Amino acid sequence: MSTLGHQYDNSLVSNAFGFLRLPMNFQPYDSDADWVITGVPFDMATSGRAGGRHGPAAIRQVSTNLAWEHNRFPWNFDMRERLNVVDCGDLVYAFGDAREMSEKLQAHAEKLLAAGKRMLSFGGDHFVTLPLLRAHAKHFGKMALVHFDAHTDTYANGCEFDHGTMFYTAPKEGLIDPNHSVQIGIRTEFDIDNGFTVLDACQVNDRSVDDVIAQVKQIVGDMPVYLTFDIDCLDPAFAPGTGTPVIGGLTSDRAIKLVRGLKDLNIVGMDVVEVAPAYDQSEITALAAATLALEMLYIQAAKKGE
């Protein structure tokens, strides 16, 4: 019998209910799951407004509003009938110890991937993507990155733990190939010398969804893909509850259509990050994040059903 709040040897802790009311499994490595959801309640690398540590709980809470819909529009099937998805709760680490969080998250991810599972992770600030990339690169080799964000997170400020430096560090460690990676929705300062293809928010909003998706597919090719979605990619009208909001972003409708268009890519890992519910209004940011996460699972289910 599992006890709520009990810490297990695998450094996970239970939650009252799983994302989308999916089954909780606190020993996911030995399960028959295809995809495992992990919450990472960490916001010590935040440069703006803190509070992302509460993101996983907010995403799970609001996801109950989505749980009732089995044949989700516009899909003609129930994702849960094609994918075995479990929620293993949140990573446990000594609060205040960013290095321990990073090491434990990487170890957890490596163990899941070695067991043949795939991961959907909830942040937390965007720094959590770096240890996840390290684990995925060990298993899949160098990857392409598909990155939705208002910021490129390629800043070289010398900080070890900073949610704006991961995609400066990751190419230098050989985790991702910038020449096959794309950043979508950017509308802040960026350095073109980093090698990423940047599709800024202005052009993504002006171009057709099909046109943008075609370019993403051409850039990525057949490489294994890590998909990361910082919720501040959305305009603050649709996602006010985040640490570093920037006006002029994507609508939630356009973001969902873009995610659906990634179905044919070889996506090996996914995350949704930077939900800070203290700044949210009527849970709309958490709902956007939960819906995008659900769409990510649907594109995996659609591909499996082909």
Curated annotation (Swiss-Prot):
Record key words, sorted: Hydrolase, Manganese, Metal-binding, Polyamine biosynthesis, Putrescine biosynthesis, Spermidine biosynthesis
Manganese is among the record's keywords: yes
Protein EC: 3.5.3.11
Pathway assigned to this chain's UniProt record: Amine and polyamine biosynthesis; putrescine biosynthesis via agmatine pathway; putrescine from agmatine: step 1/1
Domain of life: Bacteria
UniProt cofactor(s): Mn(2+)
Key word Lipid metabolism present: no
InterPro entries linked: Agmatinase, Agmatinase-rel, Ureohydrolase, Ureohydrolase_dom_sf, Ureohydrolase_Mn_BS
GO biological process entries: putrescine biosynthetic process from arginine, via agmatine; spermidine biosynthetic process
A molecular-function term among this protein's GO annotations: manganese ion binding
Residues binding Mn(2+), per UniProt: 126, 149, 151, 153, 230, 232
Reactions catalysed, as given in the entry: agmatine + H2O = urea + putrescine
Function summary: Catalyzes the formation of putrescine from agmatine.
HAMAP family for the chain: SpeB
NCBIfam families xrefs: agmatinase (TIGR01230), PRK02190.1 (NF002564)
Family membership noted in the UniProt record: Belongs to the arginase family. Agmatinase subfamily.
Protein name: Agmatinase
Protein's organism: Escherichia coli (strain 55989 / EAEC)
Taxon lineage: Bacteria, Pseudomonadati, Pseudomonadota, Gammaproteobacteria, Enterobacterales
Originating gene: speB
